[in-house]
Design a protein with these regions (language model features):
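Conserved alpha-helical "signature site"
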Residues: 1-246, 268, 280
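Short helix/strand-capping connector loops at secondary-structure junctions
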Residues: 242-258
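C-terminal accessory extensions/subdomains outside the catalytic/core fold
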Residues: 252, 258-261, 266-278
Length: 281
């Protein structure tokens, strides 16, 4: 089986499903300060499916609001632009990739992604990192795997076969068979979609945070990924739990009581958030 170059993988990004226009506009607004909240609210409201998902999640126990919000404008006023932007972006991306042919477990993939997003947000709150960047980075940390499985299906079947035959994790199997891994491809996709550099970096280094990542979003996502694998929220009993780098864990400064809260928050919100974000309409 021939290897895949990063250039070949990047060349396939143009063939991916087109994101809703409002989602691409929201992505481009992540680091802008001159954003028109009213204009963006109007654009989101024009997409009925995204609006419905966003309002359902905003009104769920995930945010614990005392009063029900009925419009995107109200959601922004109550939750803030960053939270609503993260919700709409997440719902839009999942909607664009939700489902596919073959043996790949798309439902399980998104269950793990949503769980990691929730866990990353909870960890970020305790580590005093940007919670919405953590949520989006957690949701998209394995997005490169979708590029590989949908654009190179035959090669990825060989990856799965290799993992099963030598009993290694998927990252090792990808590198052995393809010569690259989903983290590299995911970072390229995040760059292609013009996400902030911090999110690109978190996706690209979620398996191996670098020194400059300590105490920051990449370390948050690295730890969240391992926790959610350990909780087996995707329902993959044979999936290996990735090791947590000790320096990444230490850099977050989370005590045992805080860790218990992270576990509780992730598990308590998971089913509801997963049902809303992965709904077909």
């Amino acid at each position: 089986m021939s290897a895949i170059t990063l250039e070949q993988a990047v060349g396939k990004l143009r063939d991916l499903p087109t994101l809703p226009l409002v989602v691409t506009e929201l992505i481009s607004s992540f680091e802008r300060t001159d954003i028109s909240v009213g204009e963006l609210a109007a654009k989101v409201s024009n997409d009925q499916a995204l609006t419905a998902k966003t309002l359902r999640l905003a009104n769920s126990s995930f945010y614990g609001l005392q009063c029900k919000v009925r419009t995107i404008d109200q959601a922004i006023a109550v939750l803030g632009l960053d939270s609503v932007r993260a919700l709409v972006t997440s719902a839009g991306i999942i909607g664009s990739f939700n489902g596919g042919a073959g043996a790949f477990d798309f439902a399980g993939f998104w269950r793990h992604a949503v769980g990691t997003a929730l866990c990353a947000k909870s960890l970020a709150r305790l580590a005093r990192c940007n919670q919405e960047y953590a949520f989006v980075s957690g949701l998209l940390h394995d997005i490169g795997r979708l590029v590989l499985i949908t654009r190179f299906p035959t090669q990825y079947e060989a990856v799965i076969a290799h993992r099963n035959s030598v009993d290694c994790d998927m990252l090792q199997a990808e590198r052995a068979v393809l010569g690259l891994d989903h983290a590299m491809v995911g970072r390229a996709l995040a760059e292609h979609w013009k996400f902030p550099v911090l999110i690109q970096h978190a996706i690209g280094h979620h398996h191996a945070p670098m020194a400059q990542d300590l105490g920051a979003i990449p370390s948050v996502v690295h730890v969240a990924d391992a926790i959610v694998h350990a909780l087996d929220l995707a329902g993959h009993a044979d999936e290996r739990v990735p090791a947590i780098a000790q320096d990444a864990w230490n850099s977050l400064g989370i005590d045992p009581a805080g860790l218990r809260r992270v576990f509780e928050d992730t598990e308590s919100e998971f089913d509801n958030a997963c049902q809303i974000l992965t709904a077909s309409n």
